[in-house]
């Protein structure tokens, strides 16, 4: 039991080998075939780690999936509201969310336009999953936007043999409450099964207006026998959160680190007020129908039809006028309330086939997808137009986007000798994008283009003496700009009078070399990576008006580093795990283009820019050092105590290595204590989670802006940061049978 508790608490933190955390041993089962075609296996020369269902369920109940994965090697996670519930995001090796390919049961969850995954839209996802594989580097071929530094491969496909039920209730700081319930029939003798789960989470959040009211539901109805599997899966997410994406500046941070300017305005008497519906709201449905067929013992075919429907909006108060509003008869000024909505449909057909012999595994697949999204703007109220104006009949703007993709790959793993595996993976991606109509500042966003990509991968892995493994691999990847990248580039070109509005797709060569040793009490691994970029789409440090990072092409850059992992288990009741990453994240001959404004008083863009040259510069939000250590004790049967610490080095908020525009290094520690009681029927678990136990006052993410004032040539800048909560607590009670 002690060994099981140690594994459940720690395997999520440390990949047992460089290639993976150990064999899953289920790739031939029908209930896992739907995801195995895009996952790396034990001998695949890809850097990855595995996280099981038990490990995911052992994290704090308020943590989103990025926060649950934050102790993985080279992973950094942050929450906008300062806690684990609500808007969260993560990076891997400094690679941002829009460059991380995320799949659920082999189907991409990345939004087709922004390429992001908005984890808040699927709350409590970790409680619904049977396993997660985190690949670092270009990884294996997968559907959807190509991985450009990391992949997160998630699975709900795990059929339990017997009926089950569970309830988890959590309560903690900032009036945070979570409830998760799950039940399933298990597989009947006729092969039928049904699983259902639902969750609810509410919190006031740490900073003002960081409240969250989120819910999710999951259902799977299926049938399987020895040769066939048919499964219908539904995943639902609903979120209502306060807007927090602006962060706060340093002066505000020093005065009140819980301050949030969102929705702030002055009334007629000069008093500070806050709009009470400064919110972000979104509902999403995912529906998957999968059929899998096993022909003989060697050939397997799986096909999935997937549909995502999303509908939501954000609403906020803008205490300043703006002109040129599309859909209105006249310009107007003064305070106003806007609502910007998104309505989208995403349809995917994915089909894979796998053939396996004793020495050869051959996998091929095709994915076809289409996305149709409408971006709709409405003015809810304006003090210029008054309360009696017919706002419903006047649409502010309508912008449409259609994106189609075709994706085909073939992958082979061949073992010419028992101690060696050769790997090759060839992928084609074709992408077609059409945008039409203006957005909130009346800039026309009519744009149409297509991209064709070829992404080859190859590698070798070696095994000897039963405890040593090594691998080497090379891969080429391409990735197209996202909608937000194109939109902001068009706007900047429009405002500055430039003609070229195109952004180039980025290209990467990823070289990986790894070694791992696994002993009875000690395990250790080292992985070296060289991620070489051309035409890299890199953040400038600025954010759009809705919190998207604005990017630009840079000719040449690289991320080069070493990832070290180790574990030591001197006794059955004690284990230590650690990982450490050292990296260089550089841009060659970086040039910064700063937009000029006329005067301090007018602050009107002149269409001119000032150029600064920095030589080889460090990429923003890419710490050169990060690491983790965790100790786990099992003092007596069915009890566990663990303490962990995460260190993240200094991060710059832009690409200029300016100390005043940077996030200082920080260290944060967490403690958990748990015990499980056996009952007449089922088990009762109690757990206490103490986050940030040393009460460190730190911030983990941010952005910056800058302009040149032409009247005196001065550079004026500012930053926005996201304070994280001081010491906070969560209690969880779990009942399972």
Task: Name each region found by the language model.
Residues 66-108, 130:
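Extracytoplasmic beta-strand/coil segments of soluble accessory domains associated
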Residues 235, 413, 472, 575, ...:
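Conserved C-terminal beta-signal and adjacent last beta-strands/turns
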Residues 418, 530-532, 552-655, 734-736:
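Gram-negative outer-membrane beta-barrel transporters
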Residues 171-202, 207-244, 282-283, 287-299, ...:
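Transmembrane beta-barrel wall of Gram-negative outer-membrane proteins
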Residues 20-58, 97:
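Short, acidic, small-residue-rich periplasmic hinge/interaction motif at the N-terminus
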Residues 294, 300-306, 463, 469-475, ...:
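Membrane-embedded beta-barrel scaffold of Gram-negative outer-membrane proteins
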Residues 281-440, 461-465, 517-518, 522-530, ...:
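Face-selective signature of the C-terminal outer-membrane beta-barrel domain
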Residues 108-136, 155:
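Short acidic/polar hinge/loop motifs at secondary-structure boundaries
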